[in-house]
Swiss-Prot record:
One Pfam match: Pro_isomerase
Catalytic activity: [protein]-peptidylproline (omega=180) = [protein]-peptidylproline (omega=0)
Expression tissues: Ubiquitous.
Organism: Arabidopsis thaliana (Mouse-ear cress)
Protein's UniProt name: Peptidyl-prolyl cis-trans isomerase CYP22
Gene label: CYP22
CDD domains, per database record: cyclophilin_ABH_like
Keywords: Chaperone, Isomerase, Rotamase
Segment forming the signal sequence: none
Superkingdom classification of source: Eukaryota
Family the UniProt entry places it in: Belongs to the cyclophilin-type PPIase family.
A GO cellular-component term linked to this record: plant-type vacuole
Enzyme class: isomerase
PROSITE patterns recorded: CSA_PPIASE_2 (PS50072)
PPIase cyclophilin-type domain span: 35-198
Length: 199
């Protein structure tokens, strides 16, 4: 999934990660849990709670966590996902967000600077509700991410999986997945992260 709008379609052979079903793996109590409160067309849609796989991909998880909490600041203002939109939705595939710079899929930055490397491909896209980094090729991770709506194994070894949606957050994800879309798979109603943080 290219953060600029294209989709990586080539399959890669699966390696590592064993037979773990990452979307239903038992939670690790040491991993951070973050949340998004989401609105659709200005109407509250619910909360998405997410476990970040700091035990598997600590650098990627920390990048996402800090954009949830707003710890990173520029000129005294928090940088992160609050007021960011889900700019790309493809039913039965994924919902994409994280471009708080431009809200159109072209913005890129990380807590480490501009882009950072693919940490590892240990976790796989085994089912719905997995958090994975959007990119424009190898080692181009920034702030954009997507949540899987189904198994997407053709993305394995190309996109870094770093967390998963917990519990009822999947219902909110399904609401986002089912919004009407216009050109470039952009929702016709604004889907906005109204609040975010760490639990």
């Amino acid at each position: 999934m290219n953060s600029g709008g294209g989709i990586v379609a080539a399959a890669a052979p699966s390696s590592g990660g064993g037979n773990v079903e990452w979307h239903v793996r038992p939670p690790n109590p040491k991993n951070p849990v973050v949340f998004f409160d989401v609105s659709i067309g200005g109407i509250p849609a619910g909360r998405i709670k997410m476990e970040l796989f700091a035990d598997i991909a600590p650098k990627t998880a920390e990048n996402f966590r800090q954009f949830c909490t707003g710890e990173l600041r520029k000129a005294g203002k928090p940088l992160g996902y609050k007021e960011c939109q889900f700019h790309r939705v493809i039913k039965d595939f994924m919902v994409q967000s994280g471009d708080f710079l431009k809200n159109d899929g072209s913005g890129c930055m990380s807590i480490y600077g501009h882009k950072f490397e693919d940490e590892n491909f240990t976790a796989k896209h085994t089912g719905p509700g997995l958090l994975s980094m959007a990119n424009s090729g190898p080692n181009t991770n920034g702030c954009q991410f997507f949540i899987t709506c189904a198994k997407c194994d053709w993305l394995d070894n190309k996109h870094v999986v770093f967390g998963r949606v917990l519990g009822d957050g999947l219902l909110v994800m399904r609401k986002i997945e089912n919004v009407a879309i216009g050109p470039n798979n952009r929702p016709k109603l604004a889907v906005v992260i109204t609040e975010c943080g760490e639990m």
